[in-house]
């Protein structure tokens, strides 16, 4: 009997500790000293540095965009190219790196379709469980929707763009079920990129830096979902991360990169999500 009581108390304490941690992180996010800079009309650049968020130092960079003033599209880099360079050459005003790709071959390993043409399909293996969301763009307007191999096989979109990625973290304000997603991928802290839609109708392009001990140590998927939800996100999709994570604006100095890529230099990637006037 005593063992049962002890176990119950232990579990309750663990539950409340987890709740307290979440509450502490929520408070840290909303009370952070967010440095805000208007890039151009309808687009804000926000950045915050945390001494401890989800137990480690963090650096978070966000572009908050009014979709009424801008259009979105996926830019294919052929061959691979840095997000900042490809986006600038394409005439974009802002961009974030896109979905997962084959480092050697240079092609996307997630479904990519533009104006009725299938450019790439989703690879088998882990990515079939990770890639369960989709950036859907019609007439420059962006949506985030669930995705699967079944939707991929049935897709007949003639106009617009479909880019699979994932996992899908939030839908209609609710945290998505991640039980079918690769646990190591979900639970390990990495640099992360994401796109989100807010309750107010804004679009967020988000990069959380990582792999910089003592400065920015990265975030896992549940933590990223929680952070975006606290920031007002309704729908949110994880993009390729790690050394690929890059947030760029033509209005920022030097190379225009808002975050600090984790490698020694900005990585060449297969595609990017671009913002155009």
Regions found by a protein language model. Give the residues of each.
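Conserved hydrophobic/aromatic beta-strand scaffold that supports enzyme active sites
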Residues: 60-64, 134, 168, 194, ...
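Conserved, well-ordered active-site substructure
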Residues: 106-129, 180-234, 244-277
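Structural recognition of the beta-strand scaffold that forms the well-ordered cores
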Residues: 93-97, 135-136, 143, 196, ...
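Active-site-adjacent helix-turn-beta-strand microarchitecture at beta-sheet edges
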Residues: 101-186
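Zymogen propeptides
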Residues: 21-134, 143
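Short, solvent-exposed aromatic-acidic interface loops
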Residues: 76-81, 149-153, 208-213
